Amino acid sequence: MYIPDDLVEEIRSRNDIVDIVSSRIKLQKKGSSYFGLCPFHNEKSPSFSVSPNKQMFYCFGCGEGGNVFSFLMKYDNLTFSEALKELADRAGIELPDVRMSAEERNRSDLKNTVYDINKEAARYYHYLLETETGNNARAYFNKRELSNGLGVSGIKSDDLYHYIKNKGYNDGQMKESGLFIYDEKGAHDRFRNRVMFPIINTNNKVIGFGGRVMGEGQPKYLNSPETIVFDKGRNLYGLNAAKNSRKNNIIICEGYMDVISMHQAGFNQAVASLGTALTDGQANLIKRYVKDVLVCYDSDGPGTKASLRAIGIFRNAGLRTKVINMEPCKDADEFIKTYGADAFQKRIDDAENSFLYEVRILERNYDLNDPAGKTSFFNEVSV
């Protein structure tokens, strides 16, 4: 694409790099520059610098550097055209009709179309919640004491399909959204008769959905498939709000209900993985904002196993980790409803060091009253 150099320079000069970078990672001023943990490689000590005078960034650890355009392209996985458009919009500068390659144009147009379809779907689900169709969903949210129920999907197999179709989108675009299943019988809504939770990225765009059954049924949770705008392993539910929290940690939990309950109780640093086991990408995403993570998974066997796995992933990412004890409740949602926010804050304050947690869980596998068992236990711990 071609944009006059003077217009590119104007867009650059009207987007302060410190503002752009600090909206995505935490920075601290040292001398005339700002420093933070590099978002492009794992490190424990801040070596990522941003110079307001030079309007440049540079990492002394990995060598990554550049201006506001290159930072946005690298961090948000954008093309130059997309980064230029985002910064122009932010500065209130109207771009002239520009030339993109066919591939760039098609990719950009498709991403924007899928964002628009997702936004329309979120509106539709919210609308249904206020109709007779949403009676059961409203009762469900009230029972769970959730004040911000976000929507409900229709009972029929093609409610959303016809709604989106009538908005002027074609089947090719709708298929790319992941909201519909196409087979020999035609098109069907992926989500039916479920309470719906829009998944919003750190740029506040709807990238997908999670749906939960209101009674019996499998799967209990159903998520959007991966699409051109939705990568499960590189996003976290609730991070769009948690990244702006004033807390110096992030709480990782299992489900949407846990996140919503925590946010309502004032713990707006809570996030959840998106129907998958925690990934390295999600750990690195968290690392962009904080150094400390509190693991708050379910207190049952699978939750304990998931906690142990998460501790290893966070450790490899260079994050400090503690574990919140939810017993005698199953999860944070149940705990907060039973004991309240103050009691939950006490559990946060008393969170267990991750190494001590690992040792305590490992201890269950050995008879420490038996010399051989005790020896085996200490050998295992020392590995």
Predicted regions and their residues:
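Conserved active-site segments centered on acidic
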Residues: 82-136
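N-terminal structured subdomain of primase-like DNA metabolism proteins
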Residues: 1-101, 339, 346
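Conserved catalytic cores of soluble enzyme domains
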Residues: 76, 244, 276-328, 335-348
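Short, conserved phosphate-binding/catalytic loop or strand-edge motifs used
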Residues: 55-56, 89, 93, 101-102, ...
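C-terminal or mid-to-C-terminal helical accessory/interaction module adjacent to the motor/catalytic core
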Residues: 321-383
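Conserved phosphate/pyrophosphate-binding and hydrolysis machinery centered on Walker-type P-loop NTPases
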Residues: 11-14, 104-114, 131-134, 153-157, ...
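A general alpha-helix detector
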Residues: 20, 67-71, 120-124, 136, ...
